[in-house]
Curated annotation (Swiss-Prot):
Function in brief: One of the early assembly proteins it binds 23S rRNA. One of the proteins that surrounds the polypeptide exit tunnel on the outside of the ribosome. Forms the main docking site for trigger factor binding to the ribosome.
Keyword Transmembrane: no
GO biological process, one term: translation
Protein name: Large ribosomal subunit protein uL23
Similarity annotation: Belongs to the universal ribosomal protein uL23 family.
GO MF annotations in UniProt: rRNA binding; structural constituent of ribosome
NCBIfam families: PRK05738.2-2
Organism: Sulfurovum sp. (strain NBC37-1)
Length: 93
């Protein structure tokens, strides 16, 4: 079962702000979140039924610091199309 704690943040980039005008928000989550799980979270905690949910996996970059390789964490992004009358201002998790 998906939980509200699996949602890390709402992304605020130039592209995501342009999509917000069309009613689409971009949500960053843990890699284990699924489309159906995200829909359940939106229904349960926000009282909103998303019209459409698209997902995208982003692999973490491999970075070097003083000769030691490290890896940034993997994440998953969701593009959530909301109904016209629904709005989510911020997500305080």
């Amino acid at each position: 079962m998906a939980d509200i704690t699996d949602i890390k943040s709402i992304m605020y980039t130039e592209k995501s702000l342009a999509l917000q005008e069309e009613g689409v928000i971009v949500v960053q989550t843990t890699p284990r979140m699924t489309k159906n799980g995200l829909k359940e979270v939106f229904k349960e905690f926000f009282g909103i039924t998303p019209l459409r949910v698209n997902s995208m996996r982003v692999n973490g970059k491999v970075k070097r610091f003083k000769g030691i390789e490290g890896k940034r964490p993997d994440l998953k992004k969701f593009y959530v199309k909301l109904p016209e009358d629904a709005k989510i201002e911020s997500l305080a998790v």
